[in-house]
Amino acid sequence: MFTTALAQRENTQLGELPLDLFAAIQSLKKELNAVILAHYYQEPDIQDIADFIGDSLQLARAAEKTNADVIVFAGVHFMAETAKILNPDKLVLLPDLNAGCSLADSCPPEAFAAFKAAHPDHLVVSYINCSADIKAMSDIICTSSNAVKIVQQIPKEQPIIFAPDRNLGRYVMEQTGRDLVLWQGSCVVHETFSEKKIVQLKIAHPEAEAIAHPECESSVLRHASFIGSTAALLKYCQNSPTKEFIVATEPGIIHQMQKLAPDKHFIPAPPMNNCACNECPFMRLNTLEKLYWAMKNRTPEITMLEDIRLAALRPMQRMLEMSV
C-alpha cells in the first residue's frame, strides 16, 4: 500500500489576527527558530517575508543546509515533502495542506509502479514535482534547472523513463538527443498558455522577448528566445539588455522580476481562455494569514513513513551530488 504524506489536516485558527502580521510572523520565527522558504510562485507578501526564495532546486538545497528547528514551506505539498525527506528531525509546516500540484497528481503511485514494471531495464529519472511515493520509486530526481545536465551524465546505452512531466521530458530529449520513455503527465498552468495570443503579443510588442519555462508545450517554447527554470528566467531578465519580456510561466515570478529589474516591463503570457488560468490555484492557497496560523499553532505538519522517506532520499541525494 502506498502512503505519501501522513499529515495533520487540522489547522485550528483561534483568536484574532494581529494587526501587524509581518511583525507577528517575525516574532514567531525567533520563538520557533524557524525559517520560511518560499517558491517564486507565491503571493508577493509571502515572498517579501520569506528568508529564502527560490526554484525547486534552490529550495531543496536551502532545506538541506538550514540550521532552523522549524521549516515553514510556502509552496505546494511535494515541496514541503522534499524538505521533510531531507530533514526528518525537523518540524515541517505547510500553510495549507490542500496546496497540491496538478503535475504531481497526474502520476498516481499505483499506475506508475505498473508503468515502471513494464520497462524493467530502465533507469527512472523523476522531476521533483512528484509525490514522495514516486520519488521512492525513482533512481534520480531532477529539477527544470538540472534535468538536461543529469540526463547527459547517464550512459547513452542506459534506457531511461522520465516522469512525470511530458513537456519537460520532450524538452530534455531535444536538448540531449536521448530517446526517453515519457510518463504522460503535465502541469495545468503551463499547458494553458495560448500560442496564438503569444504570437499576437509579440506582434504588438516587437521589442519584447518571449521567455518560457520548459514545462510549457512545444508550440509555446518555439516562440521563446530563452527557455529555463524560474531561477534561470530571473537571471536572464536581469542580465539581458532587453527592456520588455513576455513571460510564459506562473505570473507569481513577476514580483521578483520587477524587484530585480525595476526598469523593465514584464507581460504575463495569456491563457487560452479569458480567465486567471495562468495562475496556479494551488500556490494561491497559501496566504500570509495561513502562514501566521501555521506557525502559531505548529500545524499542519508534514510527516511520512520512514521507509518511504529513506527510499525517496536516495534519488534526492543523487540529484544533489550530480548537480554540483
From Swiss-Prot:
Keywords: 4Fe-4S, Cytoplasm, Iron, Iron-sulfur, Metal-binding, Pyridine nucleotide biosynthesis, Transferase. It is an enzyme of class 2 (transferase). It catalyses: iminosuccinate + dihydroxyacetone phosphate = quinolinate + phosphate + 2 H2O + H(+). Signal peptide: none annotated. InterPro entries: NadA, NadA_sf, Quinolinate_synth_type2. GO terms for biological process: 'de novo' NAD biosynthetic process from L-aspartate. It is found in: Cytoplasm. One of its GO terms (molecular function) is metal ion binding. The keyword ATP-binding does not apply. The keyword Iron applies. Iminosuccinate binds at residues 39, 56, 127-129, 144, 213-215, 230. It comes from the Bacteria. Catalyzes the condensation of iminoaspartate with dihydroxyacetone phosphate to form quinolinate. PANTHER family: QUINOLINATE SYNTHASE, CHLOROPLASTIC, QUINOLINATE SYNTHETASE A. This is Quinolinate synthase. The lineage of its organism: Bacteria, Bacillati, Cyanobacteriota, Cyanophyceae, Nostocales. The gene is nadA.
